[in-house]
Amino acid sequence: MSWLLGRNRQQPQPDQTAGFSEGGGAADPEGRTAGEKSGDSQLSRAERKAMEAYRFDSSALERAADAAKTLERSKHAREALELSKMQEATRQTEYNTKVKEYEAHIEQAKVEQKRIDHEERRKTLIEETKQQQQRAQYQDQLSRKRYEDQLLQQQRVQEENLRKQEESVQRQEAMRRQTIEHEIEMKEKNRLKLLEHELRAKARVDRENRDINLEKIRLKAQEHRTTVLEGIKTAGTVIGAGAEAMLTDWDKVLTAAGGLSLLALGVYTAKGATGVVSRYVEARIGKPTLVGETSRFAFLDALKNPLHYLKRLRAKPTDALQGVVLNPKLEERLRDIAIATKNTRINKGMYRNVLMHGPPGTGKTMFAKKLAEHSGMDFAIMTGGDVAPMGKEGVTAIHKVFDWSHTSRRGLLLFVDEADAFLRKRSSEKISEDLRAALNAFLYRTSEQNPKFMLVLASNTPEQFDYAINDRLDEMVEFTLPGLEERERLLRLYFDKYVLQPAAAGAKRFKLDTFDYGKTCSKMAALCEGMSGREISKLGVSWQAAVYASEDGLLTEKMVLDRCYSAAQQHKQKMAWLSDQERADHKSITGTAAPPLTLTAKKL
């Protein structure tokens, strides 16, 4: 900066360009000579632009010199110098800072490079490990393949050896069979030859003894003829003498006639008495063919199960609705029927006929049995489907059932299940003559009230009954599907019967996990919508099956809910299988339409 401030000034150099100007000619304002101008005129525009880049413009230096002179003459020259020094120091500091930053960036880059190298090395090691594992797996596969090939080869060798052995055995067996066949053939030939020789010898002997044999036959026939004639003569003589003696003695004639009359009377009397006794025994001791189940004493059944009959004789009347879960209004009505039936038996009044209709599995048969036990009556169950196969014997069988019912001293509750099978409408239904005759016999035996038996009919489709059957009914009770509260009560009942009681009894393979039974039953009651009481009871049996099928014999909440969900799905599937006619019948029975074909169920 000293040259700017005027220090250490040197002498001005002589202007060398002047000499060049003088020797080369006058210069133009741009400092170019005439030779240059002439040369430039000969150059192209691109060449001229390239030449202008190497030319020096001294005007900038002149302006800098003028600025330096102005600065030296200024009174603030020292402050400007200090300011320039400070600016220079600041720039130096900034430069050093940038250098440090660059060095830090370089170090960071080195660290990053090392990290990348380590990462690459780690990836390389992982890849090498993977490659080694793949090679090991490949080697293992190869070894397994070789081992399998060896096993296959050994198996083929064994099969080949076995095949050869079987072929050898077959050849030996064939040779043995051929040997045996040859022996049999030779024996047969020998036997035929021997038989031929024997027959020839016998024929030769017969030809030689022909006269002797004919004489024997002639003598034998003559003797037989003489014997037969003598027997006929003797029998005729005896019979003639007896007839002559009887006809001449009237006392013997009367005695013979009386004996024959008594013999005929005894035969026919024994035959009639046997029929009467057999019918009496059948009515008092046995049971009719149509009756499938009864609580009346049967001698043969008592011999088979004596303990069962002793327990039944000692049993006391129970509540008619014990163990039966129904709608409260329906329970109230059934209880009234049970009380009225019991008082009717006590007072020897006339029993009323009852029709119980509704979906299957809603407790109709169970209530009929409970009603008979509560009233102290005997019960008998017959199925309407058993009448049609009997054909012409159906009328006789129905009369036997009612005759048998009249012989009960305690009163009989006759329960006809699936009664619509043979009590159909005679006008619209196409029924056979035998079934029509059986229906007429049933109508004849139920035309009046009876103090000996009570008739209870059960049907899923009561609209198919003949009008005369409806006229003989005094009470019609509809059994509906259980509601939410009834389902929960049923679930609690069967959970106690099939789960809690066996678990409390200490069964070997029956353990119960700890969970909230009441809450679980409430959940299942919501899931079992549309299910009947029978289906819910089968659900209880499925819980036992789940315990017996498990490894540890422990019943958990999950197992209970899974079985319930499966039962609900099966119920929906059964409903989906119904035809259009069955869906209409289902709607008429339950009052609700069957579910759609799609199976959707909310899982607990």
UniProtKB/Swiss-Prot annotation:
GO terms for MF: ATP binding; ATP hydrolysis activity
Keyword terms: ATP-binding, Coiled coil, Membrane, Mitochondrion, Mitochondrion inner membrane, Mitochondrion nucleoid, Nucleotide-binding
Composition bias, Basic and acidic residues: 29-50
Biased composition (Polar residues): 8-19
Domain of life of the organism encoding this protein: Eukaryota
Coiled coil: 62-221
Subcellular location(s) of the protein: Mitochondrion inner membrane; Mitochondrion matrix, Mitochondrion nucleoid
Alphabetical list of InterPro entries matching this protein: AAA+_ATPase, ATAD3_N, ATPase_AAA_core, P-loop_NTPase
Region (Disordered): 1-50
GO BP, sorted A to Z: mitochondrion organization
Pfam families, per database record: AAA, ATAD3_N
GO cellular component: mitochondrial inner membrane; mitochondrial nucleoid; mitochondrion
Subunit organization: Can form homooligomers.
Function summary: Required to maintain the proper number of mitochondria in neurons and muscles.
Protein name: ATPase family AAA domain-containing protein 3A homolog
Native source organism of the sequence: Drosophila melanogaster
Organism ancestry: Eukaryota, Metazoa, Ecdysozoa, Arthropoda, Hexapoda
Name of the gene: bor
